[in-house]
Amino acid sequence: MFDSQFDVIVVGGGHAGAEAAAASANLGAKTLLVTMNLQTIGQMSCNPAMGGIAKGQIVREIDAMGGYSGIVSDLTAIQFKMLNKSKGPAMWSPRVQSDRAQFALKWREVLERTPNLDFYQDMVVGLIVEKNQIKGVPTGLGNKI
């Protein structure tokens, strides 16, 4: 089914998988993002927030490396809040709550404009390993990528 080789296959299209696929493709690797549902690429969990002490630090680091999570969060924000204001400035941490549907839509728009990136809707069910190297993945629909 697949007549091209991929340098990187990202399994899972949540916001972390979307970020990984974008980073890989932007570095020039021919990348495939495999997701169970193309309509939910980039979808947030039930708590539609980015930020906080731990996750906020990661978002800032991703942003500094050219990632999109912070940008997509800003574009789809419905509330901004600085957490831990009752503590010292070292503990302050920004958090944004986003519109879940808009967040997924914006991520999809970003990914569709990314060169070197293809999408495939299916479920990865294992790994194809040859000589201790991962060479591909089998899918639930019986394809080998």
Please provide the spans of the model-predicted regions.
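Conserved N-terminal/central alpha/beta ligand/cofactor-binding core
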Residues: 5, 22-133, 139-143
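Beta1/beta-strand and adjacent pyrophosphate-binding region of the FAD-binding site
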Residues: 2-16
